[in-house]
Amino acid sequence: MAVVVPLEDRRLKAVLSYPHFSNAHYEAVLGDLRALGVEWVVLAGGLEVGDARLIGKGCTSVVCIGMIGDRQVALKIRRSDSSRESLEAEASNLEFANSCGVGPRLFGARKNAIAMEHIRGQNFVRWLEGKPHTEAVRRAVVDILGQCLSLDMNGLDHGELSEAKKHIIINEDGKACIIDFESASRSRKRRNLTSVVSYLFFKESVSRLLAMHINWDKKVLTDIMKGYKADPSERVLVTLTSHLKLY
């Protein structure tokens, strides 16, 4: 059973000021977490940091599980060596994605921390390797395509879906969730759907697993996406699902 500790527990110092301890950074993170209503942290996850644990680690932040009241949340915490001065822009993009029906629910954000829904599940490739039922795979693919189209139509580019292994989680109910809006932008050209189609159906490590459940013609898919690039329209989802026989 995972251990739950108060924010001030000494074991969390290595997490709240990772990778290099700075008392100023630690106190700033601690203050932001308190302002978000976080009182406890769950020592759970696959990554060890001293005597604590994380569920994720990136170039600018680390992620652990916290508690706001009786709700478990994912806490994204700015690293002490981060090149980004604040996580607030990422939180703003996540909030926008939420308005499109995409991403883990945002609960709050400060300069050094984001509190959001904790998505329990596996990344898309690992989930496929677990040999789910074909119908579940088909539903997940439709879900992913639909979410990417929604982001395109509403003007937010995720920025990292051409290499989406770490950015698409399939939860315990088989529903897809796109995560990590650190590189997202509302000003550049939207490429979510074209990026994820390239990742799913043209990247060999993913497509060989999908091919056990779905059939497609690469030339036809390429032509469909060329048409979409020339004239972005929601109609593309019907065309894609028809070709992939996902209806």
Segments from the language model and where they lie:
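ATP-binding glycine-rich loop module of kinase domains
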Residues: 27, 35-88
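Active-site beta-strand termini and strand-to-loop segments that position acidic
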Residues: 65-69, 117-118, 170-172
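Protein kinase catalytic-loop region centered on the HRD/HxD motif
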Residues: 146-159
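C-lobe/activation-segment region of protein kinase-like
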Residues: 171-247
